[in-house]
Structures are given as structure tokens and as C-alpha cells.
Amino acid sequence: MTTEWLLTVADALSRLPAPPEEQFVYLLEHGTAKIGLYAPRGVDPQGPHQRDEIYLVWRGQGSFERAGERHPFGPGDLIFVPAGMAHRFVDFDDDFAAWVIFYGPKGGEQPLEDSPG
């Protein structure tokens, strides 16, 4: 069950549009954050977004391309993509699904001057 403060994978999957529609659904919005589930089938058609985003892989594995680099991913992995950066999932399993969180202002957030690292 999904409430306004608890998102379940089962409810998110049941709310995805049927193919051939893009397999994405927003589930929660708060402040600048928009949270959804992304489960592309076959090909990932997305391009750069106007806001920073975080993916948390729920199931499946494959490779992720970001700004010309390609890296493998699997369940539990977290992927960060700054606003405006080209990216996509490639060679992913048929059951791939990831939580996605868009946040911050258009153009992305700037690092804090006093942030560690």
C-alpha cells in the first residue's frame, strides 16, 4: 500500500502505464522533490533533464551511460545524474526497475562551500 509518506514497490508497479507507453509514473511530490518509478522496456529513450536526479535500482542489472562513460549497475546501486547531463540505461534486464528522484532548481544545485569532500 502507498500512502502520502510510504511508497511500496507493488503499488508503484501496478500504477505504471501499459506498454507501449513509457514505463514511468510519479508517485510523490514534496517541495522540489518528485519521486517515481522508472521501468523502461527494451530501450531507454530518455535524454537530459532540467533538474538533478538520483536513481536507486530496485531490480535488474545492466549498464548505465553518463556523459560518455559506461558502468555496470545492479540492485541496490545508487546513480546520481546532474541536471543537463546526457544519460541512459543500456543492456538492461527485462525486469529492470528503479526509483527515481528529481530535486532542486532547474539547472541543478550547486555544491555547498562547506560540504565535505
Question: How should these model regions be labeled?
Answer:
Residues 68-83:
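Short acidic-glycine-tyrosine-enriched beta hairpin
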